[in-house]
Amino acid sequence: MAMKVKDIVFMNKGDGENSYVKSAGLTLKVIAKTQPIVQKAVQSLFTGTHSTPLQVVNVADLGCALGPQPLESMSIVIESIVEKCGELGCEMPEIQFHLNDLAGNDFNTLFKGLSVVQEKYKNVSWFAMGAPGSFHGRLFPRNSMHLVHSCYSVHWLSKAPKITSEAGLPLNKGKIYMSKTSPPAVREGYLSQFEEDFSSVLRFRSPELAPDGRMVLILNGRQSADPTEKDICYLWDLLAEALSYLVSEGLIDEEKLDSFNVPYYNPSQEEVERVIDKEGSFTTEFSDTVVLEIGGKNAWSDPGLRIKGYRCFSEPILSHQFGEEVMDKLFDKAEEILAEDYKQGKEATKNISIVVVLKKKTNQTWT
């Protein structure tokens, strides 16, 4: 069965036990940690070369998902603009949010949650609309967006890299992502696909951004030059081990496991900056890594909670490949393995984010 990423990469829907709404705690921590960076980028829109104050600020949230994540991002933007306009003594502009994700995203649950923002900012004139589509292509009219924001989305690839021998045999058998045992071709394939896809994200956003527009991108990344370092690959190695167990139990076909690779890449800061420089549409105003400790005694020290956090974003793509009927068994086994790893100190202990703030270059023209 051919895998069309645009049809299956989305977060778990609804508001049930395994939904993204109930399990997006890690992403919220990333948003909180990066809030000052986003706030500064938003407020820089009011200190540029605009001949007249902005009357409408258009904001795009790429890969917005659902639940508290997009609502918190919207709140940060609104509060940043309110604060800056208060400082400058200027009239508060209207704010238009363009909430983008693939068509499979649960936009209904997303829109239901907007009442929280509505109640919180009754005196602010803001609007929200859905913008379904892939950020690997064009989404918005030329020169229309003042701010493009994305948190934990653009590390998803447009497709999994093709990792086979000349004879068409899988080279990453028993794994679903890079690992210590993967041959060099696997690492090269993933990096090449990331470079192609991230370049397309930049290339398609450039004409859409207004002059002096900003783009804030937050990606799940890595600090190490080694893309198979434990904190990076632990999740996918854990799930591959659980899937291998299901193969041994006759619950899934080994060929399905051997032929599957997740369309996901954890870049280093250097890899991100290299693509930005080569693509050439933006200047980098800020670039850094943000580290969250997820080991030890914290909210993720419970194996069950941690597995729910993994399941809420990985289940849709895994169920498409291996079947919905084995998902409970898969994540139960993963929790069992994780609990044992906790005892031995083998689990991942850090979550790494790459944060960049980009400004559209002023010398570009679009015809």
From Swiss-Prot:
Keywords: Magnesium, Metal-binding, Methyltransferase, Transferase. Binds 1 Mg(2+) ion per subunit. One of its GO terms (biological process) is methylation. InterPro entries: MeTrfase_7, MeTrfase_capping, SAM-dependent_MTases_sf. Mg(2+) binds at residues 172, 258, 260-261. It is an enzyme of class 2 (transferase). S-adenosyl-L-homocysteine binds at residues 20, 64, 69, 101-102, 134-135. Coiled coil: none annotated. It catalyses: 7-methylxanthine + S-adenosyl-L-methionine = theobromine + S-adenosyl-L-homocysteine + H(+). The record marks 149, 220, 264, 324 as: Involved in substrate discrimination. One of its GO terms (molecular function) is S-adenosylmethionine-dependent methyltransferase activity. Pathway: Alkaloid biosynthesis. Its EC number is 2.1.1.159. Pfam families: Methyltransf_7. The keyword Methyltransferase applies. The keyword Membrane does not apply. Its cofactor is Mg(2+). Theobromine binds at residues 27, 152, 155-156, 313. Involved in the biosynthesis of theobromine. Belongs to the methyltransferase superfamily. Type-7 methyltransferase family. This is Probable 7-methylxanthine methyltransferase 2.
